[in-house]
């Protein structure tokens, strides 16, 4: 098995077949919806809130609302009242089952539910998937997070419609330091490894530092990428604003941090300050344009044409050119 990450892989261009990069289609289908780009902001308290989710849905972007200090039932009701799709996160404990029951009692069925726990290859996830499939058979279930092909196979067999791959590669995640486990440092290899056995969409979660990493994720089998730090720190971001030496920052912290938990127990995340980057809409437009450019370099016109390109590994024992692997 090759071990590599985003910073030591480059994709090889093919003959361009478009007159303008704007001809390239960066959209992707997930469930019953098609979204403008294969990017979803991380479902974290300092990345998304209800107003951001409304804006994302109105503008054909995918979102997953976080599950912390939130009335999921009211959120789904609000989104449906606006005529928008509803995408929520659940854990695997009794209050999460209660949320499902409350939604059903009101006749509310979200379009997407992400079962979101740190170690998603677990019987508790299997049980929640089974409950959702029984009670809400039409909902699109995303489950995670996982790091191995065995986990992907199990989650798909249990009924997940998509799998979230990535344990601890994110900027504010310290799982690998606290536990010795995870995909930090080899996240892109994990995506490739998992995608080879997947029959349903893979969402690559974490470790994305540059816009070009989106194309690399697609090349190695992801359908979509989940991004935290690059989509935190915007003017609209819900993170607390902090001024340091006359420069404005927004706080950004991991879901398993003590800042999010409210206590120092089983902590696997940290808090950092992100420089304010401007408007979220501008960043998403730039991402779309960069993905269009990636598609043009791939010699294609559609997003999945990126999967046809060759690549090179920079440095290490695996250095060299790799042809359609």
Swiss-Prot record:
Keyword terms: NADP, Oxidoreductase
Single GO molecular function: GMP reductase activity
SMART domains in the record: IMPDH (SM01240)
Gene3D superfamilies: Aldolase class I
Domain of life, per lineage: Bacteria
GO annotation terms (biological process): purine nucleotide metabolic process
Active-site residues per Swiss-Prot or TrEMBL entry: 173
Enzyme class of the recorded protein, top EC level: oxidoreductase
Binding sites annotated in the UniProt record for NADP(+): 202-225
E.C. numbers: 1.7.1.7
Any one Gene Ontology cellular component term annotated for this protein: GMP reductase complex
Reactions the enzyme catalyzes: IMP + NH4(+) + NADP(+) = GMP + NADPH + 2 H(+)
Family membership noted in the UniProt record: Belongs to the IMPDH/GMPR family. GuaC type 2 subfamily.
Matches recorded under PANTHER family: GMP REDUCTASE
Described purpose of this protein according to its UniProt entry: Catalyzes the irreversible NADPH-dependent deamination of GMP to IMP. It functions in the conversion of nucleobase, nucleoside and nucleotide derivatives of G to A nucleotides, and in maintaining the intracellular balance of A and G nucleotides.
Name listed for the protein in its UniProt record: GMP reductase
Gene name for this UniProt entry: guaC
